[in-house]
From Swiss-Prot:
GO MF assignments: structural constituent of ribosome
Keyword Ribonucleoprotein applies: yes
CC per GO annotation: cytosolic large ribosomal subunit
UniProtKB keywords: Ribonucleoprotein, Ribosomal protein
Keyword Ribonucleoprotein carried by entry: yes
Family membership noted in the UniProt record: Belongs to the universal ribosomal protein uL29 family.
GO biological process entries: translation
Name listed for the protein in its UniProt record: Large ribosomal subunit protein uL29
Lineage top rank: taxon: Bacteria
Pfam families the record matches: Ribosomal_L29 (PF00831)
Gene3D superfamilies hit by this protein: 1.10.287.310
Length: 79
């Protein structure tokens, strides 16, 4: 997929909560920069913006799974 950093749900589930927060922060910063480039007409690949937004959604999904107890870090590592 164009623009994806390879953040598959499996990879995300193997990360610690702190690492997920760092990835989320980085992705949000990237979306901000991409939106600015899009507004000024400098964005070459519109698909990158979509891919980063999907990465953010994946990160939020994994974080929410942990919050409500669907999966825990230990469970994910053992699978």
């Amino acid at each position: 997929m164009l623009g994806s950093k390879g953040l598959s749900p499996t990879d995300l589930r193997g990360m610690t909560d702190d690492h997920l927060r760092v990835e989320l922060k980085n992705a949000k910063e990237e979306v901000f920069k991409l939106r600015f480039q899009s507004a000024t007409g400098q964005l070459a690949h519109n698909a990158r913006l979509r891919a980063v937004r999907r990465d953010i959604a994946r990160i939020y999904t994994v974080m929410r799974e942990r919050d409500i107890g669907i999966r825990s870090v230990q469970e994910e590592v053992s699978q």
